[in-house]
């Protein structure tokens, strides 16, 4: 009855059915062929209702929040929409139905006895059959799907029945999954400690969002041309539609370009395009498009039909992984190409409906699985940015969608692409506080102001904390109501206000204690909001560029408390506060490049050299291991060396987790085996395991692999595999996951060869036929470790299952094993000895009292309490089987008494566990006597109340355990009414919330008094040692579970004596079971049960088994019953006796249990596996005595290290210059080169001609300030090599001195520019001297390549560093550079690389001593002092640092330029670096409109005459690859072609601009209008192209080529390729000619078109390859298509023998036999 949690600031992103989507969904069927007779015309009557009615007419509380059964409306749009559409058809109106839908909706409170999952199913089913009624033509297609749906509904009903009864079932009868190993898909999202849990409370606000997200992967767009669908893994990894494939699918009868007269326009549209002659001027400009008729009734923008896709997908090889959202306001834009032809659509209808039916089934299943809990918590933050909610509007019928249904209200401009979209409303506060935060530069994190929830606020005076769609919580903003009302998603704000208003009204009825509890839950909500802005982990990086072209490193951030699917790309300056996480990521990337050692080699080597660990290893840094833990580590190490798989069976609380983690640390650090290791644990202990890994082994790359399918796929993409060709193939060291994920992703995980497998709570493997058992047994593992605190509580068969899992070869035959040890219960000495012998190598078992003497004692008291009168009444009814009274007033599941013992145990706990008692006696929540009724109805609660009051006064903290979840609900309600702060953890609590609850309870200043736990929830790792009192409210059937519960508090770290109070109802079945269990069951549970695998009793020679036979059960039931029936019915006297109980008297009278874990027999059996006996028989006494000196070990390690080759420089050696042999025509010199040449001639005008130095290719001899002495020229050149930036001209001049220092600053800059220009000219003229191009700089030979690279690198470095406020802590290198040979000796890492570059910028390249002495850089102890010689130090000296720094600068250049630095790119490295150097220094050309022109690739020119070719190792070209010469020429030619096309089409620039804008606005316009506009634009452009071709060329062959060049230029303004545009235009022209009855056009007629098609096909067959597919970071899809074109694979091109003989069109038909594919065009 958790009323507080209901009103925590739960995000409302998915709670509301977006009205816009309703309209879109309705449109789907209205526009289908079945409904073409419906008048689809938009008219004012469709929108004449009051816009404010929807929000001002406040329905019953909670109406704005959907019930779970409405989830299907979102996800299965078509079938459900048809249900609502029928009413619309009868009215003859295709307008909105949203308002009436909301008015007619039922109150959102859960109906008594109803199951929301069933409601969901029935609602879906009703809608689905309604679809059949209205769509008779489709009924046959859906029959089979309906049958399947019915079958699935039956299955779901069974599941719901199971769930509805789950709370009543005691813990021992439920599977462990239902307690603490439930997967995240079917868990409650709330923390029970935060309030009541009343299923009938009308104020409960169930959240449907979880069902939406649980289906995020199955809810895939079924339209085959939705480029952003989640179809990567189902369709060969394609992220986008391949347009060339679409060409193959297109039909000559393509309906995409039908005239604008679609039937579904209701006759309101005009018939356009009556004649072929279309005006070149667009009669309706884009600015004149008016969509006012299609406005939403409340003035907000409709969200896009398809949201931004998950950016996390494995894309095609070689593609850069793109951003989810680069622009903070980016919205998805769709192109007209997203629609299929009508013919394709009709053919695919059947498939689409089958797909919908299947998805509907999946949705119902998921809805049925979701636990029905109260008030979903805001911790669940599945972002709709990355876990996309798919609208099923885009089905195969989308061609007929009514225009207006897909439109948005465009208030100002149709191209308003940067609008904000509200994803979540997180909090609210008084207006102005947000501005104050910004003014004072404070954090935007909200604070809890209790006044906000005391009175109903004026929402106009409030501001809201908004999480924007596509952005992280880091970018949340405070916005007022007026700021938000015109934004998409505004309805979420309205629903948030309704929710808060209802909560405020409800708080007025609460007591002060309840309000305090409510405030605590809100503080925890705020904690989670803060958490979501904290960086948990960086999982990827990339290089992007800002608007100025500057390099911006970006990181993919996984946020604290959010899943991998909600990771976002962030700029490095935005997450500067998380520099530690960035450095950890960089360090992980470095470690991946290091290959590990082989297991068998290290095992053999370790046997000979390894000694026992007497001290804790230095790599284990989280604390100090205790002696027995170090002994346990030695046991694990010894077992690994002997290749023995083992069970670590220490008692609860002895630190098995730490010992296991240490073993993996030993493999990674001591043995250099980096994994991969697999650790499988229960969900409840997952967070604790991760925390222990981070604490003890912070250097280990541990992946927590859980979550939804989308999250796990993101994790696989970025965290699993190393795609680089160097290093190990698996990135992570250890993978931490749960049992359920292992089963779900068995196909993925089984492919990995695991070095070590650990299974926590290994009794999950006791059934050798279970799925988990068989799955893990199939995994490829070198060694295994099972971790369990209760290794021998199982039967002989189950013990064999564990041993068989460890060693299938040794323990093959189960029957033989069982036969050998079937008489263990008789304690046959020979059998025990044999068992010890077999198990000794495999088990290590210690108990607390043997090894942990310092742990305070625990005292257990059994408190026997009487039953209350109501309990006695129900106890009698159960014994009498009085169903009439037991089920009085019950509407749901009735008491069946199938298990009468369980029902009696429920009665002993609390009669309110029976619905009839709760309904009849419980009272209303607002009743003042509610607390008294709860307490007095149960004798146990009476004693608990007295006990807790006493413990509260004496400052104790309490753990309360119960088996029954419903009992925990009652206890939670009691604690809330009492005003006691508490936390709660049971099987339905999500993993992250479990950890949060434990952390909150264990916090030093925590005010939590109680912690409610399910007896079995958790396992190893739930450490609540801050509590010193344990209350076992009801004893478990298995005493071992109660012992485990006690160990939650009585464990290492406990400082106080632990008092344990076990409640037992006297004279009841409970007391008798406890007594009999003490006498008969304890030994069996602790040693070996006497049950076989089927759970039946086996025949025994001696003792009976643990199950009770018929006579025993009868005796148990009779116990106390006689006295109960003899008692006089005097309820008042019984009540007085209960109230008069004195707690002190009860405690004195309590039976005290001595602290004996086991008896002597059990001790004897398990004693064989204690510390002293962990070595197996193979070990002799001298194994650990093979002492060798530690120094010798280090020496041996260094001697055995692989002899790595010396690092070769990864940058380009200037001695391998480019071998370009073609000269550029004089007339075709680029304008920037011409300007520079004129500048050079101007500077040289003053000086008489001086002969060039020998071997130089260019000369700088003139300076406006006068002559430069050779000595100063030498110094100037060297100093420029040091600083490289004219911004540091003062430093350069000061260091040079002489004439340069005396010259004015303008002259200094002029000299700097002259040096750079001269080097460029030297490179361009292509000198082939052995040392590369050399410049004659005032008589000083300057290596041009070397200087240009240095200057370019230093300038890039300066620009990058200038972005940071604190460069020393924030600046990092862009990419990883392999460590040098000397790195290991001084501990050099990537941070030192960054500091070295900073020192170079501050002090100059080569000034190593200044860099060393700069204390801020922290390199004093990592660089050798200048006075030390090579043999005197292992630290890097000047040559080492120069080599490292040069390589780093080149790596920075390569990363910033987007070049591939992998080995496969090395073939063209030297040439491309050279070209890049030239182009980087050129100012971007500007075209006539002032826009940035393409980055020109200059054709290198040389002097006339024969060349002296430098002999060098030839670069081998792969087959089909173009030569360097031909490639450069082709690039130049294509660039000139583009300039020419731009000139001749300059008159059509307006049309081209409109075509480009249409790419980004087509999603907002009706499809027919889009097609009409495209047709018009293509007709205008096509006619102009035809005229240009006829004007310029007479040769048909060249006409074809010129036509394609022009269309390729047009394609830079469109999403389609030039070939596709040409094909569409030709088809349009042909159709127009056929309509007019005219023969082939005189302009490029049909014969020419056929020849074009034939020629295109031939060209494509030789050279065309598929376009790369990927998601780019740009805002518009048009830009994406164009950028993707840049990556087109180039086909083979002929070597041009003499470029002077070629015209601008290149060689004619005789020069080449095939059409060369053009290189990619730069974006315009």
UniProtKB/Swiss-Prot annotation:
The biased composition feature labelled Basic and acidic residues covers: 126-144, 403-412, 1227-1237, 1504-1520, 1669-1691
The annotated regions of Acidic residues compositional bias extend over 145-157, 170-186, 239-264, 278-297, 337-350
Q: Which residues form a coiled coil?
A: 138-164, 505-525, 1126-1163
Q: Give every Helicase C-terminal domain span.
A: 943-1094
Instruction: Please indicate the residue ranges that the annotation assigns to the motif Nuclear localization signal 1.
Output: 320-327
For biological process, the GO terms are:
chromatin organization
Q: Where is the composition biased (Basic residues)?
A: 301-313
Q: Where is this motif: DEAH box?
A: 760-763
Q: Which GO terms describe its cellular component?
A: nucleus; plasmodesma
Q: DNA-binding: present as a keyword of the record?
A: yes
Per UniProt, the keywords (alphabetical) are: ATP-binding, Chromatin regulator, Coiled coil, DNA-binding, Helicase, Hydrolase, Nucleotide-binding, Nucleus, Repeat
Q: What is its EC number?
A: 3.6.4.-
Instruction: Name the job this protein performs.
Output: DNA-binding helicase that specifically binds to the promoter of target genes, leading to chromatin remodeling, possibly by promoting deposition of histone H3.3. Probable chromatin remodeling factor.
Protein name, please?
Protein CHROMATIN REMODELING 5
Originating organism: Arabidopsis thaliana (Mouse-ear cress)
Taxonomy of origin reads: Eukaryota, Viridiplantae, Streptophyta, Embryophyta, Tracheophyta
């Amino acid at each position: 009855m958790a009323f507080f949690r209901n009103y925590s600031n739960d995000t409302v992103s998915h709670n509301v059915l977006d009205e816009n989507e309703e309209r879109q969904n309705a449109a789907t069927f209205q526009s289908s062929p079945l409904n073409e007779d419906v008048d689809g015309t938009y008219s004012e009557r469709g929108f004449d209702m009051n816009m404010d009615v929807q929000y001002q007419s406040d329905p019953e509380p909670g109406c704005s929040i959907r019930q779970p059964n409405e989830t299907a409306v979102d996800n299965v749009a078509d079938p459900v929409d048809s249900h609502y559409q029928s009413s619309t058809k009868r009215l003859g109106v295709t307008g909105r139905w949203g308002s009436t839908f909301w008015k007619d909706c039922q109150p959102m409170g859960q109906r008594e006895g109803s199951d929301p999952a069933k409601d969901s199913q029935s609602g879906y089913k009703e809608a689905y059959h309604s679809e059949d009624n209205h769509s008779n033509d489709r009924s046959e297609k859906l029959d089979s799907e309906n049958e399947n749906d019915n079958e699935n509904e039956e299955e779901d009903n069974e599941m719901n029945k199971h769930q509805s009864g789950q709370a009543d079932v005691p813990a021992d009868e439920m599977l462990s999954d239902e307690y603490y190993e439930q997967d995240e898909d079917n868990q409650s999202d709330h923390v029970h400690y935060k309030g009541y849990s009343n299923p009938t409370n009308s104020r409960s606000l169930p959240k449907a969002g979880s069902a939406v997200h649980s289906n995020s992967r199955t809810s895939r767009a079924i339209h085959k041309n939705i480029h952003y669908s989640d179809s990567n893994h189902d369709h060969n990894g394609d992220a986008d539609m391949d347009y060339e494939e679409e060409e193959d699918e297109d039909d000559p009868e393509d309906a995409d370009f039908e005239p604008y007269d679609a039937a579904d326009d209701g006759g309101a549209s005009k018939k356009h395009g009556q004649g072929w002659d279309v005006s070149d001027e667009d009669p309706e400009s884009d600015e004149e498009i008016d969509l006012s008729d299609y406005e939403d009734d409340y003035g907000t923008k409709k969200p896009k039909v398809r949201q931004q896709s998950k950016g996390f997908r494995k894309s095609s090889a070689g593609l850069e992984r793109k951003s989810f959202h680069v622009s903070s306001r980016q919205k998805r834009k769709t192109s007209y190409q997203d629609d299929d032809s009508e013919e394709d659509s009709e053919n695919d209808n059947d498939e689409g409906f089958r797909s919908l039916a299947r998805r509907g089934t999946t949705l119902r299943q998921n809805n049925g699985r979701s636990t029905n809990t109260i008030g979903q918590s805001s911790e669940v933050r599945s972002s709709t940015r990355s876990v996309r909610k798919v609208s099923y509007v885009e089905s195969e019928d989308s061609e007929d969608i009514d225009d207006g249904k897909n439109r948005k209200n465009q208030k100002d401009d149709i191209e308003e692409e940067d609008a904000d979209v509200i994803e979540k409303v997180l909090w609210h506060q008084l207006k102005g506080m947000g501005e104050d935060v910004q003014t004072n530069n404070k954090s935007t994190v909200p604070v809890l102001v209790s006044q906000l929830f005391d009175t109903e606020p004026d929402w106009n005076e409030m501001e809201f904390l908004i999480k924007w769609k596509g952005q992280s919580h880091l970018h949340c903003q405070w916005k007022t109501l007026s700021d938000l009302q015109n934004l998409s998603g505004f309805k979420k704000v309205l629903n948030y206000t309704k929710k808060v208003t209802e909560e405020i009204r409800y708080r007025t009825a609460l007591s002060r204690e309840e309000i305090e509890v409510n405030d605590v839950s809100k503080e925890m909500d705020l904690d989670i909001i803060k958490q979501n802005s904290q960086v948990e982990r960086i999982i990827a990086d990339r290089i992007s560029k800002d608007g100025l072209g500057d390099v911006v490193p970006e990181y993919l951030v996984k946020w604290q408390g959010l899943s991998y699917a909600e990771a976002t790309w962030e700029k490095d300056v935005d997450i500067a506060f998380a520099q530690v996480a960035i450095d950890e990521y960089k360090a992980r990337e470095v470690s991946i490049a290091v290959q590990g050692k082989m297991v068998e080699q290290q095992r053999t080597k370790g046997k000979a050299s390894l000694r026992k660990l007497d001290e804790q290893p230095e790599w284990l840094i989280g604390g100090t291991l205790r002696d027995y833990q170090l002994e346990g580590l030695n046991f694990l190490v010894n077992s690994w060396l002997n290749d023995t798989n083992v069970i670590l069976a220490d008692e609860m609380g002895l630190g098995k987790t730490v010992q296991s983690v240490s073993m993996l640390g030993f493999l990674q650090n001591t043995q250099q085996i980096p994994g991969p290791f697999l650790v499988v644990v229960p969900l409840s202990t997952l967070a604790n395991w991760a925390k222990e890994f981070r604490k003890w082994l912070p250097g280990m790359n541990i992946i927590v692999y859980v979550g939804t399918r989308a999250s796990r796929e993101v994790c696989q993409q970025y965290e699993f595999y190393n795609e680089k060709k160097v290093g190990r193939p698996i990135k992570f060291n250890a993978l931490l996951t749960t049992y359920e994920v292992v089963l779900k992703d068995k196909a993925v995980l089984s492919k990995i060869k695991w070095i070590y497998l650990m299974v926590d709570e290994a009794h999950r493997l006791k059934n050798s036929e279970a799925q988990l058992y068989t799955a893990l047994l199939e995994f490829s593992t070198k060694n295994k470790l099972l971790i369990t605190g209760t290794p021998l509580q199982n039967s002989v068969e189950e013990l064999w299952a564990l041993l068989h899992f460890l060693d299938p070869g040794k323990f093959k035959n189960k029957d033989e094993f069982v036969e050998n040890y079937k008489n263990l219960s008789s304690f046959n000495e020979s059998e025990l000895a044999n068992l010890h012998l077999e198990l000794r190598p495999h088990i290590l078992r210690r108990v607390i009292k043997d090894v942990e003497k310092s742990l305070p004692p625990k005292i257990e008291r059994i408190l026997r309490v009487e039953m209350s009168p109501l309990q006695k009444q129900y106890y009698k009814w159960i014994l009498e089987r009085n169903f009439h009274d037991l089920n009085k007033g019950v509407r749901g599941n009735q008491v069946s008494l199938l298990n009468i013992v369980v029902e009696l145990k429920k009665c002993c706990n609390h009669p309110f566990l029976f619905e009839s008692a709760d309904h009849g006696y419980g009272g209303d929540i607002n009743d003042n006597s509610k607390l008294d009724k709860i307490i007095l109805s149960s004798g146990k609660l009476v004693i608990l109340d007295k006990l807790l009051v006493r413990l509260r006064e004496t400052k104790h903290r309490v753990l309360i355990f119960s088996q029954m979840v419903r009992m925990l609900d009652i206890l939670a309600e009691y604690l809330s009414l009492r005003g006691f702060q508490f936390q709660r953890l049971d099987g339905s609590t999500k993993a992250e919330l479990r950890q949060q609850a434990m952390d909150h309870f264990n916090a030093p200043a925590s005010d939590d008094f109680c912690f409610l736990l399910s007896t079995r929830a958790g396992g190893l790792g739930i450490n609540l040692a801050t509590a010193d009192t344990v209350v076992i409210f009801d004893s478990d059937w298995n005493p071992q579970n109660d012992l485990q519960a006690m160990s939650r508090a009585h464990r290492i770290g406990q400082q106080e004596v632990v008092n344990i109070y076990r409640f037992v109802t006297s004279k009841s079945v409970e007391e008798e079971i406890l007594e009999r269990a003490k006498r008969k069951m304890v030994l069996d549970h602790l040693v070996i049960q006497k049950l076989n695998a089927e759970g039946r009793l086996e025949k025994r020679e001696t003792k009976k088994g643990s199950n009770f036979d018929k006579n025993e059960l009868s005796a148990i039931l009779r116990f106390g019953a006689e006295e109960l029936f003899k008692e006089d019915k005097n309820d008042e006297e019984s009540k007085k006796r209960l109230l008069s109980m004195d707690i002190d008297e009860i405690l004195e009278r309590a039976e005290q249990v001595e602290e004996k874990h086991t008896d002597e027999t059990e001790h004897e059996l398990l004693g064989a596996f204690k510390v002293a006996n962990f070595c197996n028989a193979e070990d002799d006494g001298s194994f650990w005595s093979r002492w060798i000196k530690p120094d010798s070990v280090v020496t041996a390690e260094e001697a055995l290290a692989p002899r790595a080759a010396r690092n070769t420089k990864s940058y380009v050696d200037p001695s391998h210059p480019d071998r370009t042999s073609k000269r550029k025509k004089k007339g075709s010199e680029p304008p920037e080169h011409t300007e520079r040449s004129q500048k050079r001639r101007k500077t040289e005008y003053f000086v008489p001609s001086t002969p060039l130095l020998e071997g130089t290719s260019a000369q700088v001899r003139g300076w406006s300030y006068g002559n430069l002495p050779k000595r100063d020229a030498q110094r100037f050149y060297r100093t420029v090599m040091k600083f490289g930036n004219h911004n540091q001209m003062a430093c350069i001049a000061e260091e040079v001195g002489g004439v340069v220092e005396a010259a004015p600053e303008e002259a200094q800059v002029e000299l700097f520019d002259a040096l750079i220009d001269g080097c460029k000219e030297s490179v361009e003229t292509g000198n082939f001297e052995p040392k590369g191009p050399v410049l004659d700089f005032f008589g000083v030979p300057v290596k041009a390549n070397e200087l240009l690279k240095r200057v370019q690198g230093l300038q890039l470095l300066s620009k990058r560093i200038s972005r940071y406020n604190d460069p020393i802590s924030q600046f990092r290198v862009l990419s990883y550079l392999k460590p040098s040979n000397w790195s290991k000796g001084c501990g050099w890492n990537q941070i030192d690389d960054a500091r070295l570059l900073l020192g170079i910028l501050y002090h100059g390249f080569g000034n190593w001593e200044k860099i060393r002495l700069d204390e801020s850089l922290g390199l004093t102890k990592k660089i050798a002092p200048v006075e030390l010689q090579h043999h005197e130090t292992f630290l890097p000296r000047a040559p080492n640092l120069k080599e490292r720094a040069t390589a780093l600068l080149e790596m920075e250049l390569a990363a910033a330029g987007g070049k591939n630095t992998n080995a496969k790119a090395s073939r063209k490295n030297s040439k491309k670096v050279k070209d890049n150097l030239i182009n980087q220094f050129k100012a971007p050309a500007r075209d006539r409109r002032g826009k940035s022109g393409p980055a020109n690739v200059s054709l290198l020119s040389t002097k006339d005459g024969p060349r002296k070719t430098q002999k060098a190792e030839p670069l081998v070209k792969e087959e089909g690859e173009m030569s360097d010469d031909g490639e450069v020429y082709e690039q130049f030619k294509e660039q000139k072609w583009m300039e020419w096309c731009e000139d001749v089409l300059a008159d059509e620039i307006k049309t081209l601009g409109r075509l480009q804008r249409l790419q980004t606005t087509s999603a907002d316009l009706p499809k027919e209008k889009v097609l009409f506009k495209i047709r018009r634009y293509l007709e205008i452009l096509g006619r102009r192209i035809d005229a240009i071709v006829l004007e310029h060329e007479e040769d048909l062959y060249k006409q074809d080529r010129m036509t394609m060049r022009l269309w390729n230029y047009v394609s830079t303004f469109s999403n389609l390729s030039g070939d596709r545009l040409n094909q569409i235009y030709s088809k349009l022209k042909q159709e127009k000619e056929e309509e007019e009855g005219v023969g082939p056009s005189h302009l490029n007629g049909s014969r020419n078109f056929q020849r074009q098609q034939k020629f295109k096909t031939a060209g494509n067959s030789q050279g065309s390859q598929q376009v790369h597919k990927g998601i780019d970071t740009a805002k518009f899809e048009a830009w994406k298509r164009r950028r993707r074109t840049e990556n087109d694979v180039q086909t083979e091109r002929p070597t041009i023998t003499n470029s002077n003989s070629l015209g601008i069109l290149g060689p004619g038909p005789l020069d080449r036999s095939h059409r060369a594919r053009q290189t990619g065009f730069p974006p315009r």
